[in-house]
């Protein structure tokens, strides 16, 4: 059975007019992992705990949550998303991340998809996933999605092929990697719609840079859904007083 994954995770903010929303990549360069706790190295040169990072975002009225696209793992064919424009829009939504663990997992997914993390950082994040205790179903879906994305990044970007990594890599990613190395032009042309060898050797985990089978950019489709439902998107959670002081659960 194909696994369901949460992809296309980006910060959702209102623009300066407060009439529209925009999606933004996280301003994170690296993570530090200590057991089941995460610290983030930001683009501004700061080292902050996940609770502090969440508190900073929730204290701004512009932050609404995290975008999400719900995909079966084989629907991301690396070079495109195997959905029509209409079906894609029915898979888009927003995640409130109403507790620290959900927020942390959304941040991890977003950074693995959209940031250039080192191999060591990716392995540290796997250790973090092993350390956290996820009890409810949506948290387990976030946890599962994060693990599959991290293992996919290690497999595609660093060519790690250990069984404990490959078992979490979607089959389409494995086929794509094999195609890149064996130059099977027939597979490249008809399955992945690649027209040249240079295209076969360039790829990204950024879902919003993909196009649907109709040629529509996923990022634009996601924005269309969010703006069509704004301002009726769910509100971000209220912070308990101790979180506003930067304390963790």
UniProtKB/Swiss-Prot annotation:
Family label: Belongs to the herpesviridae cytoplasmic envelopment protein 1 family.
A GO cellular component entry from the record: host cell Golgi apparatus
Keyword Nuclease: no
Organism annotation: Human cytomegalovirus (strain Merlin)
Pfam family, one: Herpes_UL7
Protein name per Swiss-Prot or TrEMBL: Cytoplasmic envelopment protein 1
Subcellular location: Virion; Virion tegument; Host cytoplasm; Host Golgi apparatus
Superkingdom as given in the UniProt entry: Viruses
Described purpose of this protein according to its UniProt entry: Plays a critical role in cytoplasmic virus egress. Participates in the final step of tegumentation and envelope acquisition within the host cytoplasm.
Keywords: Host cytoplasm, Host Golgi apparatus, Virion, Virion tegument
């Amino acid at each position: 059975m194909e696994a369901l994954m949460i992809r296309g995770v980006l910060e959702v903010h209102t623009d300066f007019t407060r009439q529209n929303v925009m999606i933004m990549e996280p301003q994170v360069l690296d993570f530090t992992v200590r057991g089941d706790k995460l610290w983030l190295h930001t683009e501004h040169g700061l080292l902050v705990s996940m609770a502090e990072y969440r508190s900073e975002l929730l204290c701004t009225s512009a932050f609404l949550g995290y975008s999400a696209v719900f995909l079966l793992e084989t629907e991301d064919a690396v070079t495109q998303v195997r959905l029509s424009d209409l079906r894609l829009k029915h898979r888009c939504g927003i995640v409130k991340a109403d507790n620290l663990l959900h927020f942390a997992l959304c941040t991890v997914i977003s950074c693995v998809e959209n940031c250039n993390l080192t191999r060591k950082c990716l392995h540290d994040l796997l250790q973090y996933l092993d350390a956290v205790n996820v009890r409810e179903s949506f948290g387990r879906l976030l946890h599962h999605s994060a693990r599959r994305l991290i293992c996919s990044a290690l497999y595609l970007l660093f060519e790690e092929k250990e069984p404990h990594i490959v078992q979490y890599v979607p089959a389409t990613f494995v086929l794509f990697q094999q195609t890149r190395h064996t130059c099977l032009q027939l597979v490249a042309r008809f399955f992945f719609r690649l027209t040249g060898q240079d295209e076969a050797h360039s790829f990204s985990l950024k879902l919003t840079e993909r196009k649907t089978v109709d040629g529509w950019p996923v990022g634009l489709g996601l924005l269309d859904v969010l703006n069509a439902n704004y301002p009726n998107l769910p509100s971000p959670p209220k912070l308990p007083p101790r979180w506003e002081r930067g304390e963790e659960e």
